[in-house]
Every structure is written in structure tokens, then in C-alpha cells.
Amino acid sequence: LGEAIGDAFLPVLKFQHRDVIDLFLPLETGFHNLAIVSSKNRYPRQGRKTALGLLGAGQMMFLKTIVAVNPEHDTKDLDLLLDALDSKVEISEDLVILPGMVADSLAHASPWENIHDKLLIDATSPIEGDPRYLRAPLGGCPDSLEVSASGIDGIVQARMLRSSMLVVTTDIEGGPSPSENVETDDEEGARRQREKICSIRDSIWNLEGASNLRWLFITDSDVDLSDDSWKRVLLWQFFCRFDVGRDLHFDSDRRRVCWDATAPIPSQGGPLPVRRWPGVTLHDPEVLARVDTWLQEGGL
């Protein structure tokens, strides 16, 4: 329903924002955590201008992350999105962070209610007149990096998404359960979580062949990277669990980014606070069983 509403109102949005070619807000990201916009690209950085305009467009002001892509890009093809992030995004140049902006009240990962940082990713092709126009093609990593990363202590699974993009899963001791709300702070658990993420990040970045690993995603092991649904689950984890100001970690040259998408443990003692963390589903198993029985009896 949400995606249908987005398609229905797209003509109105394009009339108000003439640079917009297409727009997609994926269901898996709750509609307010990610937008993919294809923009006209007639002059340098037009995609960024388009994205910034949308961040001031009514309820789109609640967006956490917006990715600008080329005019011909199919915004609903998530494989094409990975291709664009891999081949067109230089971390030091093409990630724009807007600190202290308006957040959705349902953005539970934000450090303060209704306030968070926003992320604009420019995945458009540089055109003539842009200093990036003549830059060399962005390099990647050897396939063997996936095997090397799998052997690091604390990593459950590892998978290369693209040549510059690796996702790993891990178990966080005391991390929030998908079935329960976490209402109280756990300073020691949050400290262990931060230390584990830093340890995994540094271990991977120090691997041979990891110099061009521009994107490192770390998430919980409740996603199976060998399952058919892994892409859809990752999309939710990557964009709903992280906070731009708290969970993006850059290397010293700002050429690589580590994206922490593990479920945050509530605390006040870190660089930025973590608020209460809601369960993903709170349905009583007995109630679910009764509903299933009722549906079966009704032939539904």
C-alpha cells in the first residue's frame, strides 16, 4: 500500500520538483529511512541539489538516508543500487552528512526523539565541469577477502556484495531480542558492543587486499546470508537499525566507511545516546495460533 501511494503521488512531486525523474521508498525500510531518487544530470552536482530539495518536501523531511542516482537508473532495482554504490561513490567525496536535522518520531535509532543526522549519498556519474569527472575508475577487492574475513574472531558469516562492499554478521552479547522491548540502559553491554564492532572493523580493514573495501557493513546474525530472502532482510537492518551520527565509522583518510547495523543496546555513556529499543514483533504466540486456526476454519 505504501509503495502504491508513492507511485500515485509521484506525478505531483515531479511537478513541484522538476529535477526528479523517479523516486522509490522501499517497503523494507519503513518508507522514512531510505529514498532512492533518479535525477536529471545536466550540470555538476544536480543530483545533490535534487536530493536536498526533497529533504524539505513535506513529510519527506523525516527521511534518514537519500541516494541520488542517474536519470536512466531503475530506482526499484536494488541490484542496480548496489552497482551504483560500488562503481560511482567515493566515500570521501560523495557522502554528505547533515547534522542535527528533523527525524521521524518512529525513528527509534535516533539518539534524541525527533532529531538525527541525515545522510545524502551521491551515486550519480560526474559530468564535464565536475572535478570528479576525470578521476580514475574506482578499484575493488579480491574475492578472497570474503574467505579471509570469515576467519576473523567474532564473525559468523561474510559475503561480498560487490567488489568494494562486504557484509559480515556477528553475535552481540546482551543485544536486543527481536521479540522484546528494551526499556532500560545497559552501559556495560553497550560498551562491549562498541568494542566488538571496532575490533571487527579494524581486523577487516587490516586484511591484505582490503584497501579498496569502501563499504563494510556489520549486522546481527539473525539474518542468514545464504538464505533467499537475505537481501530484503539486510535492507531493513542496514537502514532501520543505524544512526548516521553514531553508527558510521570512517578510516583515518575517510576513504572507507564501516556501517554498524547491529541492533543498538540502550545506553547514555557512548559518543551519542541510544534510546529504548522496540521489539520487531510483540504478537503473543497463543494469539497467533488462534488466528491461524480461525483462518483455516474459515477457509482463508
Task: Report residues per predicted region.
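Charged, compositionally biased interaction regions
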Residues: 1-300
